[in-house]
């Protein structure tokens, strides 16, 4: 990957080094915004956006620094209340907002920063990105969520959070404590979306309907992926509608929300949507 560097950043909150992949802007001499781009549930050591998400193609001519923290598997990019025996110590919100951002913006590190930040993600990363933007509106100028779930208190959001954590051997109570605790409520953007009022917001979801495009993509993949992807995307559709409606109820109409008929939860879907999503938030970062 050209223009992609791997930085190792010491995290006091997580008490370990964290590897962060950074895609440099096309023109390193010109000031550029920083776009924090969060991964899906796997959270591997190489960002899925690079492996499967078409990132290099979309940003080949763009003047933006893309920041991809790695190794956040099943974390929801949040601060956990307890260390987890399977997953370890997770303090992702603190790491991104209090440790990583100030570090990257120091002039001596050579990233020419224009003062604007965006945060974005897909699936689990969308949950983390939209929460982080809502909780830290002073930090972000734009947020983008592809196929995420933004309530933690409703039945779908609660179940998605639980399934994500347990799928990697974690205990959901180590994340936010017992269901209904202050931390569960803190992460529920649908009940308090006020932090999104003064930033550009782009949300996208398909509806889980299987079309020919999905059948073609899944030809060489196991059938359960298609079935699970359909169910998941039906869920994220309901979740996205819920946030859109909550924002409207709070008097916000600036959000750009795209509902696509046809499409299941897969990298093929996210890859196809990334160019549109980026163009939607780009003006607020330049």
List the model feature ranges, each with a label.
Residues 1-286:
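Non-catalytic cap/lid and distal C-terminal segments of serine-dependent acyl enzymes
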